[in-house]
């Protein structure tokens, strides 16, 4: 949907392809150093930061009125992807016993994969019915909700170990 938004904001097909290539290059360049940063600051902090970056990117795509701004948020999305994807998996591995790590990560990817279809359908329906801004604002709100759920447990205390 990010690439469709770039197209909607006036980029040509070739420019969208170039933007996606640059996104992937930036992601590849940032993944290793951000993995090291996650080791230093803590996986929980990196996962929380990832939820926040995701929300910021989706707010940006909702409010972007030019392709220039949307491109900036696409490259911020590369930062999110590089920071969150590895840290999220590593954090998951801290939540289960050693003998269950591979199964837990497999289950996580299964659930994410299965839920991507209805999530994408809902996003597309929101876009068609109410416009891109409504769809992206909904995504941002859900990311902020996920961040809040991640940050606190039922007693209002921090829910992750660092």
Language model region names:
Residues 83-96:
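Intracellular juxtamembrane helix-capping segments at the cytosolic ends
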């Amino acid at each position: 949907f990010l690439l469709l938004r770039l197209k909607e904001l006036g980029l040509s097909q070739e420019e969208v392809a170039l933007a996606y290539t640059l996104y992937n290059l930036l992601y590849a360049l940032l993944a290793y150093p951000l993995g090291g940063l996650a080791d230093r600051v803590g996986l929980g902090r990196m996962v929380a930061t990832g939820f926040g970056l995701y929300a910021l990117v989706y707010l940006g795509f909702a409010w972007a009125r030019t392709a220039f701004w949307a491109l900036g948020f696409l490259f911020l999305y590369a930062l999110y992807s590089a920071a969150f994807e590895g840290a999220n998996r590593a954090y998951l591995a801290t939540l289960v016993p050693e003998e269950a790590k591979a199964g837990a990560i497999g289950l996580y990817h299964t659930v994410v994969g299965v839920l991507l279809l209805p999530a994408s359908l809902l996003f597309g329906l929101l876009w068609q019915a109410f416009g891109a801004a409504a769809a992206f604002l909904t995504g941002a709100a859900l990311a902020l909700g996920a961040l809040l759920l991640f940050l606190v447990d039922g007693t209002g205390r921090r829910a992750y170990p660092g």
